[in-house]
Amino acid sequence: MKKLILLAVFWQTLNISAYCETGNRTASGVWPTVGFTCAADHLPYGTRVTLPDGRTWVVQDRFGGGYRDRLDLFMPEPDCWKWGRRLLRCRVETP
């Protein structure tokens, strides 16, 4: 039997910040991976978010505040400071 896979693809302008190692697992229970893990309250786990530079991140964590337009990228602490906060239009693919 074949499975039907539904995929939603859309563009969204997101307020993007960065976070670094806390020594804890993500809200989904996995260990965060630099350059891969991101946090979002409004997107399901497993959602792929592609930034304008072509890098793709996967939602594996939550903010916990019910934000609808925010994304937090997991990266090393020095890179977090360089990243700051950016408003970017991103491609979003939900599972």
Short names for language-model regions:
Residues 8-95:
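Solvent-exposed, well-ordered loop and adjacent helix/strand elements within mature globular domains
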